[in-house]
Amino acid sequence: MTSFPHPSTSESGPDPDSEPNREEQAHAYCLRLLTARARTRAELAGKLTQRGYDEPVVARVLDRLVDVGLVDDEDFAEQWVRSRHLYAGKGKRALAAELRRKGVDDEVISSSLADIDAGAERDRAERLVRDRLRREKLDDEPGSDLKVKRRLAGMLARRGYSQSMALDVVTVELAGERERRRV
């Protein structure tokens, strides 16, 4: 039976705080974050800085991730807009605000929002109002329409639709729903 000597404490491995090792740790951390969902360069930079990584290490790691295509703010913005507009019913203003919070450049934001035309935005607003109106109790009391209009216009405003579009859509859809219920 052969025995191996115990590793010497004086011959320790690489210093865990050395620059190359810190860079690899930061890279591994970014990869773990990216497995959950796509992230912007600014989001990853914020997470790394929060963890205490130095600016040069952060820049090198993010440059590596951009070079291999794992971080792409333009692609992120396009996917975000498509997903949040379709599934969450967000309007252009709300989407732009969300992307700004995630650190996406204004130029990239405007190009990704260009895919949503006014007709598609209005169609989505109409569907949202129609769905909500089906569950809404509509009274014949005076002033009840005003309450419903305010509630629905507020819902659309919180989702980032313009006030003029919200009021127009709510007025048209409310009239249509009243007509549908009369028949």
Curated annotation (Swiss-Prot):
Disulfide bonds: none annotated. It is found in: Cytoplasm. The keyword Protein biosynthesis does not apply. GO terms for cellular component: cytoplasm. It comes from the Bacteria. The keyword Isomerase does not apply. Residues 1-12 have a biased composition (Polar residues). GO terms for biological process: regulation of DNA repair. Pfam families: RecX_HTH1, RecX_HTH2. Keywords: Cytoplasm. Residues 1-26 are annotated as: Disordered. InterPro entries: RecX_HTH_1st (IPR053926), RecX_HTH_2nd (IPR053924), Regulatory_RecX (IPR003783), WH-like_DNA-bd_sf (IPR036388). Modulates RecA activity. Belongs to the RecX family. This is Regulatory protein RecX. The gene is recX.
